[in-house]
Each structure stands twice: as C-alpha cells, then as structure tokens.
C-alpha cells in the first residue's frame, strides 16, 4: 500500500474566504501515484475548515450570511474565548459548523466526486499563514 503526505499552505488577505483547492489536491493525487484508495484533506488550524460543495458564488455568499447569523463576529465581547485577548471566538464556532476534514474516494486515479462537488478551504480568521494536510493512501 502506498502512503503520500503533502502540506498545502494558504494566507488569505481577508478575515474570511472560501478557496477552491480541488486543483491542488488533484495535483497531489497525481504525484502520489495512487489509483485506488482514499484521500483525506484536513485543515491543520482551529479557525479554518475543509469541506465539499459546489463552486458557485451565490452559495458562498449564502454561507457568509448564514455563518455570520449563527456566530456574528461583533460584538467581540460576546465570546468568553475573547476574554483572553483574542478576537476570534466566532471563527472557532464557524469552523466547527463547516467541519475539519473531508475524505474522498480515489477511483482509477481520480477523485470520485458527485456532480458539482469540489473541495474548499474555508478561512474564518485570515491574514496569516495556515496549512492543510493532504494524506492519500491506497494502491
């Protein structure tokens, strides 16, 4: 069985962003040489997320609005976490809702997606470097 590991690094210029990372993950898969197996992609930071969905700008705006309703950034004082001097309590909650990782089947050397599925990096407390782990195992 083959095992492949790669780190992808992101630094978005805004507090929140959704980045389609499917091309980078596909490049990792090609480099791994795995034809049949599993591909794990996970955010290695507690205020970032990895998830699968459609790459449609209206949907991304809907996510922004919905997440801000669930866990608004302001007032910063509303979060006990922020009493430590942080201002990102909302980002931790948004990450929890959107998830830490995805696992995608690898079939015949390709990510086995359903219609419209893409892999996204979700950033909820940006403007600094963060990493995503890609781990691929199989034959």
Where are these regions (language model features)?
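Active-site histidine-anchored catalytic micro-motif
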Residues: 1-139
């Amino acid at each position: 069985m083959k095992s492949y590991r790669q780190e992808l690094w992101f630094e978005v210029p805004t507090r929140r962003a959704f980045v389609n990372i499917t091309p980078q993950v596909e490049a990792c898969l090609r480099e791994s040489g795995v034809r049949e197996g599993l591909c794990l992609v996970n955010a290695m930071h507690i205020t970032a997320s990895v998830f699968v969905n459609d790459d449609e700008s209206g949907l991304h705006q809907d996510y922004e609005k919905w997440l801000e309703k669930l866990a608004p950034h302001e007032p910063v004082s509303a979060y006990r976490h922020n009493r430590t001097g942080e201002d990102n309590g909302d980002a931790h909650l948004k990450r929890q809702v959107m998830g830490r990782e995805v696992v995608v089947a690898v079939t015949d050397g390709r990510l086995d997606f359903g219609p419209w599925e893409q892999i996204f990096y979700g950033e909820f407390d940006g403007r600094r470097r963060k990493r995503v782990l890609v781990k691929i195992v199989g034959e």
